[in-house]
């Protein structure tokens, strides 16, 4: 909102015009789900097409900082000579990726793509930002490369006012090294003796059918088919049954195994289908804690929150650590071998190893001052130390926040040093540069073996994507499932959390959002109860007819706790993953937003 006040213009590319876009008065380009890659190929073509006239492309940046854009800048490890520019121009397949070609697939008008290409030019300060939604799609393993490539074409990296990357909730405008970090609890590291994992797209089939692809844990070996016989599901967090695709299969898997055990604070979907539920205490029932953290940092870049117990643990609830110790004792293990010291000592260890960056932007210092009296009050072992904020003051405030002001030394521009001198400041790739052609990425994805990709981004029709909605693409004959479904986040929930809160359920009724055009064609009016049918499930929801969803798309909010009618198999709650198939492709990223 501050950027809007300062005059920034926002362009929003999404199948649904969300509340954030409305608040920013954003121009809307209503794209079809799972078509971001053809859209960006059309955008790249339009940037090349108009470059001579408009001066759009930053050729100096491309030539200096990237490999693989054109034939003159290929990486040393390339196994073929295909480059991005020639692919976009149609040299290899005879199909130029024109805005008209892109428009037929993505639904955005070709003229709008050309207009955006000019906006993306090097003369403008542009933040080209992508959420994770367009990556949660089948067959888009090269999408991050393509986002990077479009940003690089305009030179939108490494300098003030220019950004290319991801943006979502806690990582929106929050890049750079952490200014204050949580410390370490001091617990010894436990090595995992099992070098194995089951991909989320295969987990239910692995239980039901007894086979899966093995690729290793924390690395990717060439995949091999392996047999497995799972008898117990033990869950110690999350709500996997509700958040994984193929929920109907998941329920079947939960019912098949001999036993399901769940740690749970609330009676979630996963807990409801469990045989044993171990009640877990909430953070409000625990002695102390420090909360920081997002997908990038161990903490929010500028802040760590601190809390103390509000109430004693209710009923029979225990912490996960207490349950682990009690189960361990029943298995003949000593408590001190599982957790050598208690939660209070762990908290103290984290507290005294918290670090903050000094005003010079470089020097690391102790964040918290601890006295001998503090140590005595906590009942822990340790030494007093100096720090920037007294422990008692931290707990009184409930937050440690680094003060910011204009001109401080905490600013951060990603890749700034690399962009100024890529030879002296290489990035962590085989070439040391941004790899528009990435042999290592293609080799890894292809070794996993669900489907193959090329080292440069290329368009692969998406399984369960827009083209799949037609019985015949050339004649545009609709198929059995002509609508695409997306699962936007919704004000009632954070993922699946809070769906049991009655006030929120009353305020936000979890409808299915449908366009005016599609509603009129189906004879649906606002408030009608409708049946949604996909290849893998059915649910009923009230309809909200709106102009904020593009035609051909319905939006079923993410995270409702499933309520299956056992006689009909129809979900009464509108759980999005009850309608979504598990279809591993490429590196097997879950294709939540490629669904019909």
Segments and roles (model prediction):
Residues 4-7, 11, 16-123:
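Long, well-ordered, tryptophan-enriched scaffold segments
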Residues 29-34, 73-78, 92, 99, ...:
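Hydrophobic alpha-helical scaffolding
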Residues 77-209:
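Active-site phosphate/pyrophosphate-binding segments
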Residues 308-310, 316, 320-376, 382-385, ...:
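Long, contiguous, secondary-structure-rich segments that constitute the structural scaffold
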């Amino acid at each position: 909102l501050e950027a809007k006040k300062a005059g920034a213009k926002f362009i929003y590319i999404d199948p649904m015009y969300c509340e954030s876009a409305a608040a920013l008065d954003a121009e809307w380009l209503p794209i079809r789900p799972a078509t971001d890659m053809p859209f960006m190929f059309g955008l790249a073509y339009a940037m090349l097409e108009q470059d001579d006239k408009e001066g759009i492309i930053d050729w100096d940046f491309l030539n200096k900082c990237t490999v693989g854009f054109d034939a003159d800048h290929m990486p040393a490890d390339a196994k073929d000579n295909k480059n991005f520019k020639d692919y976009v121009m149609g040299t290899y397949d005879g199909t130029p990726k024109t805005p008209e070609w892109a428009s037929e697939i993505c639904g955005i008008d070709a003229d709008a793509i050309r207009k955006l290409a000019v906006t993306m030019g090097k003369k403008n300060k542009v933040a080209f930002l992508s959420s994770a939604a367009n990556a949660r799609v089948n067959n888009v393993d090269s999408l991050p490369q393509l986002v990077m490539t479009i940003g690089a074409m305009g030179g939108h990296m490494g300098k003030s006012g220019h950004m290319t990357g991801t943006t979502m909730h806690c990582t929106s405008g929050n890049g750079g090294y952490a200014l204050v970090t949580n410390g370490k609890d001091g617990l010894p590291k436990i090595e995992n003796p099992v070098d194995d994992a089951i991909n989320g797209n295969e987990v239910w089939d692995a239980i039901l059918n007894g086979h899966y692809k093995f690729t290793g844990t924390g690395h990717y070996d060439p995949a091999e088919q392996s047999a497995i016989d799972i008898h117990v599901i033990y869950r110690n967090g999350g709500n996997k049954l509700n958040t994984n695709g193929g929920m109907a299969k998941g329920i079947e898997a939960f019912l098949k195994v001999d036993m399901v055990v769940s740690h749970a604070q609330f009676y979630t979907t996963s807990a409801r289908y469990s045989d044993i539920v171990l009640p877990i205490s909430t953070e409000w029932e625990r002695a102390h804690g420090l909360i920081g953290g997002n997908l990038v940092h161990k903490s929010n870049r500028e802040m760590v929150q601190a809390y103390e117990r509000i109430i004693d643990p209710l009923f029979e609830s225990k912490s996960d650590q207490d349950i682990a110790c009690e189960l361990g004792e029943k298995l003949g293990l000593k408590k001190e071998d599982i957790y050598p010291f208690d939660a209070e000592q762990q908290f103290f260890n984290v507290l005294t190893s918290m670090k903050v960056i000094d005003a010079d932007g470089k020097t690391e210092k102790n964040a918290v001052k601890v006295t001998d009296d503090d140590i005595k009050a906590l009942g822990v072992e340790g030494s007093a130390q100096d720090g920037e904020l007294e422990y008692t003051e931290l707990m009184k405030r409930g937050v440690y926040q680094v003060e910011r002001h204009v001109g401080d030394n905490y600013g951060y521009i990603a890749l700034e040093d690399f962009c100024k001198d890529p030879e002296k400041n290489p990035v962590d790739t085989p070439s040391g540069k941004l790899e528009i052609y990435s042999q290592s990425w293609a080799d890894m994805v292809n070794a996993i073996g669900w489907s193959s990709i090329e080292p440069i981004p290329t368009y692969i029709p998406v399984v369960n994507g827009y083209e799949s909605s037609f019985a015949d693409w050339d004649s545009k004959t609709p198929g059995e499932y002509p609508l695409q479904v997306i699962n936007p986040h919704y004000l009632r929930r954070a993922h699946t959390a809070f769906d049991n809160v009655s006030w929120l359920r009353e305020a936000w009724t979890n409808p299915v959002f449908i366009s005016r055009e599609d509603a009129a064609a189906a004879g649906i009016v606002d408030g009608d109860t409708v049946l949604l049918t996909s290849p893998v499930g059915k649910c009923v929801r009230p309809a909200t007819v709106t102009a904020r969803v593009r035609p051909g798309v319905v939006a079923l909010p993410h995270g409702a706790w499933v309520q299956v009618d056992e006689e009909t198999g129809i979900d009464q709650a509108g759980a999005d993953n009850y309608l979504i198939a598990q279809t591993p492709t490429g590196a097997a990223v879950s294709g939540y937003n490629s669904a019909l």
